[in-house]
Curated annotation (Swiss-Prot):
Catalytic activity line of the entry: (2R,3S)-3-isopropylmalate = (2S)-2-isopropylmalate
UniProt cofactor note: Binds 1 [4Fe-4S] cluster per subunit.
Function: Catalyzes the isomerization between 2-isopropylmalate and 3-isopropylmalate, via the formation of 2-isopropylmaleate.
Enzyme class (EC, first level): lyase
Assembly and oligomerization: Heterodimer of LeuC and LeuD.
One protein family per Pfam: Aconitase
Name of protein: 3-isopropylmalate dehydratase large subunit
Cross-referenced InterPro entries: Acnase/IPM_dHydase_lsu_aba_1/3, Acoase/IPM_deHydtase_lsu_aba, Aconitase_4Fe-4S_BS, Aconitase_4Fe-4S_dom, HAcnase/IPMdehydase_lsu_prok, Homoacnase/IPMdehydase_lsu, IPM_dehydratase_rel_enz, IPMI_cat
Binding site for [4Fe-4S] cluster: 300, 360, 363
Amino acid sequence: MGMTIAEKILAAHAGQEEASPGDLINAKVDIALGNDITAPIAIKLFRQSGAAKVFDKDRVVLVPDHFTPTKDINSAMQVKMVRDFAREQELSHWYEGGDSGVEHALLPEKGIVGPGDLVIGADSHTCTYGGLGAFATGVGSTDLAAAMITGEVWLKVPESIKFVYKGKLRPHVEGKDLILHTIGDIGVDGALYMAMEFTGEVIDALPMAERLTMANMAIEAGGKAGIIAPDAKTKEYADGRVIRKPVFYASDPDAKYAKVIEYDVTDLEPQVAFPHLPENTRPISQVGEVPIHQVIIGSCTNGRIEDMRSAARILTGNKADKNVRLIIIPATPQIYRQAMEEGLFDTFLSAGAVISPPTCGPCLGGHMGILAAGERAVATTNRNFVGRMGHVESEVYLANPAVAAASAIAGKIAGPDDI
């Protein structure tokens, strides 16, 4: 019996010829990742273990991004703990300030993750790197601490679901809409502890940024990982960027899947996920009148330069509604600089936007755009749970950058064709 791409990567990192769903394996990790929320716990456990050194200073990556720039004394103390540990351990990949950014945009940009890698991160959206053809998954701080010490992680090999996307996308329909549509179909537990393998002619045509967006939200369907087999576009992205030699895996023709789900997305509209779950999706034509107070364009889901350009195309020559706070957050300093050099900031500022430094900030209700009771936001983020972006009586609607920009202009949820 053949293997899926997920099974092949896990087998290789476990030193095995093959791996099957349900197998318990110990696998060597290529990258162990932590941030300013999760790394402090892992560091405390590391200290308690009596370990002196991390297993490999080139493979432990620490990126403060959730409460940065630090918003208060507690967050400053957490970042200080991580900073001190990174310096003590002489980590090669410690990023802060003008060299940092939102971790799941930063690591691909810097080539720290690549095709064929096994990446574990103490952040649920570590699954983002599956867009590059890696097996990447979120773990708790305890597993991160163990990986920092041993270089290994134990995993149960997941079953895989194969998603096949056929047709051709309409204008303003992006990878974000594909994944929202998928989650809306299967539900937030529809891929529980499964590898979601995205395939088909539509995926083949997607640029890397949108592939990363799709993989990023696999966890919102309960997925253990989201993964796209690497191809010529992946190679083009990886060449001269990825610091380790990439390995291109592909599923065997006779690989076994728990399910195969096909979608013809030719007529798919931009999608909007209503509160308070990402599965509550509706096409833009069925949204109705939903006034809003804030728009967030950014995050590890949609904060890349392609997302900035998508928003700018809609905002050009337009202004945000007087009742809408438009906040734009480029995910890394490099994206920030590129957006500035391309003149996108002129467009954003002319539209009345606030441009934030790179941060996760509002996505988790941390800072830089918290909602009050009764307020609604359209966001290009990945979660819209109760209280996710602020008060428990606020609401978050998830959408792609073009829809978010159009909504800012309209003062209500709107599609680009409405502007």
